Amino acid sequence: MNKITVIQGDITNIASEAIINVANSSLLGGGGVDGAIHRAGGPVILAECQAIRSRQGGCKVGEAVITGAGTLPADYVIHTVGPRWSDGRHNEDTQLKSVYLSCFKLVGHHGIKTVSFPNISTGIYGFPKKRAAAIALDVIKHCIAENRTIEKVNLVCFDAENYDLYLKLLN
């Protein structure tokens, strides 16, 4: 059974145990996916993010933290900070790999079986879409092989270009 599914749509409407939020380092909400998740999940997500911020000062690039999901169709939101693309010579690939590995570490720790990822860093952060998709799939396949309890990973693409890229790379 193929455990990776590619979906074109809004991640806030996808039912899974955990959804990944591409946050900023403050964890206080923002634009794009981050803003959509905070709006759809309600104030409980921001309150939990503020508590994390009080304890550890936010979240660094490549790291991840977990909160409840509020009114989203999920149990958890895993917040991570993706890298900004510079020129490919400033560890951007390694940082993006760390994003996925940090998310999967929390998935394993919490016994999560289904998780939904948006496209990470390919919007305003400028990461080349094909490069980001290849990195994502490489790490996801590795993590699925390492963690046999993962049943399903949804790759939720807001735009057709990322959706088509994932489909091509998976086939």
UniProtKB/Swiss-Prot annotation:
Catalytic site positions: D34
This enzyme's EC code(s): 3.1.1.106
Signal peptide: none
PROSITE patterns named among the record's database cross-references: MACRO
Residues bound to substrate: D10, I11, N24, G32, V33, D34, S121, T122, G123, I124, Y125
UniProt keyword terms in alphabetical order: Hydrolase, Plasmid
Reactions it catalyzes: 3''-O-acetyl-ADP-D-ribose + H2O = ADP-D-ribose + acetate + H(+); 2''-O-acetyl-ADP-D-ribose + H2O = ADP-D-ribose + acetate + H(+)
GO molecular function, one term: ribonuclease inhibitor activity
Keyword set includes Hydrolase: yes
SMART domains hit by this protein: A1pp
Limits of the Macro domain: 1-171
GO aspect biological process, one term: purine nucleoside metabolic process
CDD domains: Macro_OAADPr_deacetylase (cd02908)
InterPro entries per record: Macro_dom (IPR002589), Macro_dom-like (IPR043472), O-Ac-ADP-ribose_deAcase (IPR024900)
Pfam (any one): Macro
Function: Deacetylates O-acetyl-ADP ribose to yield ADP-ribose and free acetate. Down-regulates ribonuclease 3 (RNase III) activity. Acts by interacting directly with the region of the ribonuclease that is required for dimerization/activation.
Family recorded in the similarity comment: Belongs to the MacroD-type family. YmdB subfamily.
Quaternary data: Homodimer. Interacts with RNase III.
Protein name, as recorded: O-acetyl-ADP-ribose deacetylase 2
